[in-house]
Amino acid sequence: PRQGKAPGKDCIGNRPIHEEIDMKELGRIITLPKIFDPRGNLTVAEGETHIPFAIARTYWTYDVPGGESRGGHAHKECQEFIIAASGSFSVTLDNGEQKKTYHLNHPWEGLFVDVNIWRTLDDFSSGSLCLVLASHKFEEEDYIREYDEYLKFVSSKNSQNLSKTENQ
């Protein structure tokens, strides 16, 4: 798996962000700084400080009807950080071999999703707001929107990585 060093001084999970992290883990919850104040609390997420990439795009989903799901795709190059800014929802991550579901319901926590990971968001509570910080601007060619195509893509990537390892 690809290893990466995330620059900065804060935390990814419970580890300092500058330590090596396995960028192919099936998601990682990152706890962001919380500033408690009687006038209202504040949480901040800075790219390359609190999350392991520079932020190129921000988008959010809201008013998701009951029973509907979002996502249903993977990215070839774009990393994402998903936050339940309000309410709650579930995110199921799938690398073609295993799946893991996270329930997001705290605005001071987010889910880091690396490249080549299929994601599906569902179980949205009423009034929920899903905030996503992305490492790349929107490019349709970065998306894999069909699951069968995704499985072929990750199988090909895994074969390429195995060949590189054997040739070293």
Positions of the model-derived regions?
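Short, Lys/Arg-enriched N-terminal segments with co-localized hydrophobic residues
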Residues: P1-D22
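Well-ordered alpha/beta subsegment
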Residues: H106-G110, N116-W118, D122
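Non-catalytic, conserved peripheral segments adjacent to functional cores
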Residues: E20-E109, S126-G127, V132-L133, F138-Q168
